[in-house]
């Protein structure tokens, strides 16, 4: 649906300029903003919007709201986007209005305003259902069911009373619920935290709503149930009203063998964002400060709950997802298309099997001998990097790749600050 945004905006601009037919006009900068948005080039969009601070059109209210939403200024985003949809109800730019509702739904979800998230998704179905593709419509209906079921659940709260340094065992650490201690990992690539069904049953976790479908990193769709844990403790940190996706244990058959501990779940992006800042060290510590200090480089944003970081490659600005659940860095079709000639001339096509939650998939790839880039303030060089040539899931359609934990081999620590939206490597 994003591909219709530029066309919709051009119709608006054409109508507005109809009195000037026959006169040659300079390209309208709003068209560039629309292209940056639909291509998920959020860092360039932010900078372009900032340069248009004196522009006061209704369309600018949409783009300012979009920038606020992806850079985690949720109160401002909601205000701007609500102003846009209310003002544009009778306007012609229907695809922009639809995108505004998508961003509003996401802002409500990340704020823990689940009832409003469901209402925004329902608005999309009611107003635009006839023009949605099947996958997008199914996903929207799925989210209406999910957030409607959680409508009466209070927003998640995280209480960090003191600086915490947690010694991990193979990147797993103990949490406590109802007096029961078990191990979990952490995964910024997971839109919801995860509990295995066995521990959810043991803890009598309350389940809300019907089964929902989620898309895994391999592009496969799996069924899960939604549960809420009223209180979980990580050392002295208290996590309240955390939403978990409850999945069958058989989706994680090798957890104990891989990690050497009895892992029963994952803390996903909503809980990690609630910590405000996390630092993972090469030596295996997870550091969570009580009061994160301000950071000055805004080089990270959100796509949904997925952190996206800015990467410099040969002077070009790329956007890569940051997935702490991925052991390796991958490059995706947008990168392949941009550098196709060079990649094809230097490597032969091959197949690779990717594992994910509950499934695996074989994908066509090329392999780069070396990928040198700058991220988080540090120059990095990775060898034998797979370049996916076909789209397998949503992130592979819009972003240049995924940064995995192999970058930690060249750093002492990695910090994600969700207040300043900063990604820092040291």
What residue ranges belong to the model's regions?
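Bacterial N-terminal signal peptides
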Residues: 7-16
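Positively charged n-region of N-terminal signal peptides that target proteins for export
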Residues: 1-4
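Pepsin/retropepsin-fold aspartyl endopeptidases
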Residues: 20-426
């Amino acid at each position: 649906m994003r591909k219709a945004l530029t066309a919709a905006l051009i119709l608006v601009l054409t109508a507005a300029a109809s009195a000037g037919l026959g006169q040659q006009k300079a390209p309208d900068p709003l068209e560039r903003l629309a292209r940056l948005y639909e291509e998920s080039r959020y860092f360039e969009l932010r900078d372009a919007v900032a340069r248009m601070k004196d522009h006061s059109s209704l369309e600018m209210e949409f783009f300012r709201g979009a920038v606020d939403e992806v850079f985690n200024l949720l109160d401002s985003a909601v205000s701007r986007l609500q102003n846009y949809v209310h003002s544009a109800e009778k306007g012609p730019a229907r695809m922009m209005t639809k995108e505004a509702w998508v961003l509003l739904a996401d802002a409500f979800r990340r704020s823990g305003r689940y009832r409003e998230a469901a209402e925004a998704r329902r608005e999309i179905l009611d107003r635009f259902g006839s023009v949605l593709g099947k996958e997008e419509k199914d996903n929207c209906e799925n989210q209406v069911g999910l957030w409607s079921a959680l409508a009466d659940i209070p927003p998640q709260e995280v209480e960090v009373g003191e600086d915490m340094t947690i010694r991990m065992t193979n990147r797993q650490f103990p949490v406590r619920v109802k007096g029961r201690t078990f191990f979990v990992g952490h995964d910024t690539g997971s839109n919801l935290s995860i509990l295995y069904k066995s521990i959810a049953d043991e803890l009598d976790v309350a389940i809300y709503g019907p089964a929902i479908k989620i898309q895994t990193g391999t592009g496969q769709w799996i069924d899960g149930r939604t549960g809420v844990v009223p209180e979980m403790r990580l050392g002295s940190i208290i996590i309240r009203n955390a939403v978990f996706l409850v999945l069958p244990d058989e989706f994680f058959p090798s957890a104990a063998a891989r990690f050497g501990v009895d892992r029963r779940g994952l803390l996903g992006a909503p809980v990690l964002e609630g910590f405000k800042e996390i630092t993972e060290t090469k030596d295996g510590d997870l550091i969570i400060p009580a009061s994160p200090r301000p950071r000055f480089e805004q080089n990270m944003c959100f796509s949904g709950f997925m952190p996206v970081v800015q990467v410099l490659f040969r002077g070009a600005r790329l956007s890569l997802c940051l997935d702490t659940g991925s052991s390796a860095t991958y490059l995706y079709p947008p990168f392949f298309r941009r550098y196709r000639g060079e990649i094809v001339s230097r490597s032969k096509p091959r197949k690779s099997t990717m594992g994910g939650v509950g499934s695996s998939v074989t994908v066509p790839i090329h392999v780069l001998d070396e990928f040198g880039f700058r991220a988080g303030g540090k120059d990095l060089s990775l060898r034998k990097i797979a370049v996916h040539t076909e789209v397998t899931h949503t992130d592979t359609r819009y972003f240049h790749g995924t940064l995995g934990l192999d970058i930690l081999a060249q750093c002492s620590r990695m910090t994600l600050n969700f207040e300043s939206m900063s990604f820092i490597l040291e």
